[in-house]
A protein has these predicted regions:
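Hydrophobic/basic alpha-helical segments enriched in Actinobacteria
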Residues: 28-31, 92-99, 104, 109, ...
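C-terminal domain-tail junction helix/linker
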Residues: 3-4, 11, 225, 247-251, ...
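Short coil/turn helix-boundary motifs
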Residues: 24-28, 85-88, 201
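RNase H-like DDE/DDD metal-dependent nuclease/strand-transfer catalytic core used by mobile genetic elements
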Residues: 106-108, 121-122, 136-167, 171-300
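Residue-centric detector for conserved, function-critical "anchor" positions
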Residues: 1-44, 49-61, 77
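Basic, flexible linker segments flanking DNA-binding modules
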Residues: 7-8, 46-148, 211-217, 260, ...
Length: 349
């Protein structure tokens, strides 16, 4: 052995050390001197000596038995629950509650999971629905403004009387086209939202005759729709009334895949930015104030806030066709500034 004595040593090492101490004491060394040479605390040596006499020199296994540890019968009940209810409950969380529901054992979900893992058992779980293939845009869609609108609702729960806000964002230009505050999510709100958006973009006038004379509209007309509305699979999006309204106004519908919010990323991103950058909206309780604030935020979002996804111009710039010129002016300005700095720092002969 060499070096300091570790904090834990086995019984064989202790026996060797105690033998060295005995030999040194017989040779006339004091206990303190030999312990100092061995870098061993004297109290530790005395404790080993007493344990050697009692036959307990070997350390007990590390750890202990916590006073809140499971009892044997509880572990047995967990395993029994697995056999009886595992195929029904499918998860350790439900199985833990099944134990108390049946009055057999009261344990937490993590305890059930740990006991089953220790026994090499595994619950089948509920398989995730397979993610479908993303549908491509229809062939008639063009990558320009007012061709792709993405829409969805968000919730502002502090405004109890009208907590739901619908919004539409233009996928190409990222303009926040329209928004309405309402108390419920039905096809009626969808109609109001889209009529407001169409009017704001100057598209409603050409479609008004369809609303005035719906009986004269040929719903089987194969002419390209005026635009494509992208949404998730909410009830008001899929309802027959909404479908009929969209068909009347020649608005195509495109639904994202279930459990895949990325398919509606444009509107999800809009609401995320709105709430993160304007947290006061989440504290407003008066619907009239909330509606005014949302309209103010919408105006700022469209005309002031620079949007990264469209090259750091405002959505209004992109929507009105100024985006390319602004981005070009920046590139030209950067190049000119670089040349000016080089000229200023270039040493003169």
């Amino acid at each position: 052995m060499s070096g300091p004595i570790p904090a834990r040593v086995d019984s064989a090492a202790k026996t060797v050390l105690l033998g060295l101490i005995d030999d040194a004491v017989k040779a006339g060394w004091s206990l303190g001197r030999i312990c100092g040479l061995l870098e061993l605390d004297r109290a530790r040596a005395w404790r080993w000596r007493h344990r050697q006499a009692a036959g307990t020199l070997e350390d007990a296994a590390p750890g202990g038995h916590p006073i809140h540890g499971l009892l044997d019968w509880e572990e047995a009940e967990i395993l029994s629950l697995f056999e009886e209810w595992g195929p029904v409950d499918l998860s350790h969380r439900k199985l833990a509650h099944r134990g108390s529901y049946t009055g057999r054992v009261w344990v937490g979900p993590s305890t059930v999971d740990r006991i089953l893992a220790r026994a090499g058992l595994r619950l089948p779980g509920r398989p995730r629905p397979p993610r479908g293939q993303k549908k491509p845009w229809p062939d008639w869609v063009q990558w320009k403004k007012n061709q792709l609108w993405c829409w969805d609702a968000s919730h502002f729960s502090r405004c109890v009387s009208a907590p739901i806000v619908y919004g539409i964002v233009d996928v190409v230009t990222r303009k926040w086209v329209a928004t309405i505050l309402c108390s419920e999510q039905t096809s009626s709100q969808v109609k109001v939202l889209f009529l407001a958006a169409l009017e704001a973009e100057g598209l409603l006038e050409a479609l008004e005759w369809r609303l005035d004379q719906p009986d004269q509209v040929d719903l089987d007309d194969e002419a390209a729709p005026v635009l494509l509305a992208v949404s998730d699979n909410g009830p008001e999006m899929r309802s027959g009334e909404t479908r009929a309204f969209m068909a009347l106004l020649t608005i195509g519908q495109h639904f994202g895949r279930p459990y895949t919010p990325q398919d509606q990323a444009w509107i999800e991103t809009l609401w995320g930015h709105v709430k993160a950058e304007n947290p006061h909206l989440l504290t407003i309780t008066d619907p009239e104030i909330l509606a005014k604030e949302l309209e103010r935020v919408r105006h700022t979002y469209n005309t002031v806030r620079l949007h990264e996804a469209i090259g750091y111009v405002t959505p209004d710039d992109e929507h009105e066709g100024r985006g390319d010129a602004i981005r070009l002016a920046r590139r030209v300005g950067l190049a000119a500034a670089d040349q000016a700095r080089r000229a200023a720092h270039r040493p003169t002969p």
